[in-house]
A protein has these predicted regions:
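A short His-aromatic
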Residues: 97-101
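Conserved catalytic loop of SAM-dependent methyltransferase domains
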Residues: 171-210, 229-231
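Alpha/beta-hydrolase-fold catalytic nucleophile elbow
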Residues: 125-127, 175
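A short glycine-rich, Lys/Arg-flanked "PGG" loop and its adjoining helix->strand segment in the class I
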Residues: 106-121
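A short hydrophobic/small-residue beta-strand
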Residues: 41, 122-123
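Conserved N-terminal segment of class I S-adenosyl-L-methionine
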Residues: 1-86, 92-96, 106-109, 200-210, ...
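Short, glycine-/aromatic-enriched active-site segment of Class I SAM-dependent methyltransferases
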Residues: 127-151, 159-160
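A SAM-dependent methyltransferase catalytic signature shared across enzymes that methylate proteins
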Residues: 156-173
Length: 246
């Protein structure tokens, strides 16, 4: 599972018992790892149907003993621009691959900050500028579909908007360099063309890498992540005292 996670929870510093929001949880990949680590996780998304699958997986994990006893995992459906949580409710917020979908991204960022405790930590991940720009150049379908990507962030723009919302960037990491060529191939042949042999072959390579984690691909990805990493993750903190902005 760790191979497909964009967030490094060791670097984020997740500890058992912390209340963590997965904002825009989607299919739940980060929420499941948070649950395994003993966090009190809330998977939040606008897609109630997808959250049903997440809730089913939470129940299966509990049944199989994959999460520490006494840990809670819940799902909540709603709007990221107006989340149904009290102020300063969460110790941490994870927002992975959500902001690029939202026309009102800055409003969502302010909501993230509102529900995060002072001194709390957050991580926001988005597609990296260069790999994403290549995808947009190769295919309109990639980003123009309903619910698709509405912008490409530069790292300075993303950190600037998050800073304006009240967060302090601490460090950043790029991830998934080996995934970028796959998406370039998909965009070149058509994102909806699932039968083309080139993307199929590359996808088999990615699955093999995920299952086997050989040193050669781990080394290659570590080398290439800063250059063509498909995603960039910005790790941030919320000051314990609000910092007035000029």
């Amino acid at each position: 599972v760790a191979a497909v996670l964009t967030v490094n929870f060791d670097e984020l510093g997740v500890r058992p018992g912390q209340r963590v929001l997965d904002m825009g949880a989607g299919a739940g990949r980060h929420a499941f790892e948070l649950y395994r680590r003993g966090a009190e996780v809330v998977a939040f998304d606008q897609d109630a149907g997808e959250l049903e699958n997440v809730a089913t997986m939470f129940a299966a994990m509990e049944h199989e003993g994959e999460a520490p006893a006494g840990t809670s995992a819940t799902t909540v459906a709603g709007d990221a621009l107006q989340m149904p949580f009290p102020d300063e409710h969460f110790d941490m917020v994870v927002a992975s691959e959500i902001m690029e979908h939202l026309p009102e991204d800055e409003k969502a960022m302010h909501e993230l900050v509102r529900v995060l405790k002072p001194g709390g930590r957050a991580v926001v991940t988005v597609p990296s500028w260069f790999p994403e720009r290549v995808c947009w150049a190769l295919s309109d379908t990639y980003h123009a579909n309903e619910g698709g990507h509405v912008r490409i962030y530069t790292i300075d723009e993303l950190e600037g908007k998050l800073g304006n919302a009240g967060l302090v960037p601490v460090f950043r990491r790029h991830a998934h360099a080996l995934h970028s060529p796959y998406w370039w191939l998909k965009c070149a042949v058509g994102p909806e063309n699932n039968d083309h042999p080139l993307p199929q072959a590359y996808h088999r390579l990615l699955v093999w890498d995920m299952m086997s984690r050989p040193w050669i691909t781990r080394f290659a990805e570590e080398l290439l992540d800063p250059v063509i990493g498909k995603s960039v993750a910005v790790y941030l903190s919320k000051p314990k005292v609000a910092v007035p902005r000029a």
